[in-house]
A protein has these predicted regions:
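Conserved beta-strand in the GNAT
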Residues: 58, 62-79
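A short beta-loop-alpha structural element at the N-terminal edge
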Residues: 1-15
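Conserved active-site alpha-helix within GNAT-family acetyltransferase domains
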Residues: 87, 91-92, 112-119
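A conserved short alpha-helix in the GNAT/GCN5 acetyltransferase fold that borders
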Residues: 85, 94-102
Length: 119
């Protein structure tokens, strides 16, 4: 099930974002910089995006496992918990996000994110 993110589940979304962000950036960011991306910091990051008109969604199966943000046609912040990747959840969340776009969908990914390129 995919649900909108609001204040009631923002910390859950931020925790997913934090864990997944750290894992995806570990190869090219310093350990000190990685560790600054705590759930509290990511909650503020996501809250600011929401306050500026971005819609956030969270994929919940038996537990919350993924997040994505949509701003008009821009899809960003697509993160799936590391132990839940390569099971189709990223594709499911991406397809949902495309359906939420009000402009031509564009997926923003890091240039070295090979897993995201496969989507």
């Amino acid at each position: 099930m995919i649900v909108p993110v609001d204040e009631t589940n923002l910390l859950q979304a931020a925790t997913i974002h934090s864990i997944s962000w750290k894992e995806s950036h570990r190869a090219f960011c310093t350990p000190d910089f990685i560790e600054t991306h705590t759930p509290d910091r990511q909650r503020e990051y996501l809250r600011n995006k929401m306050n500026n008109g971005t819609k956030l969604y969270m994929l919940v199966e038996e537990k919350p496992i993924g997040v994505v943000s949509v701003t008009k046609g821009l899809i960003e912040d697509l993160y799936i918990l590391p132990d839940m990747q390569n099971m189709g959840y990223g594709t499911k969340l991406l397809l949902y996000a495309v359906g939420q776009c009000t402009d031509t969908p564009t997926l923003w990914i890091l240039e070295n994110n090979i897993n995201a390129e496969r989507l």
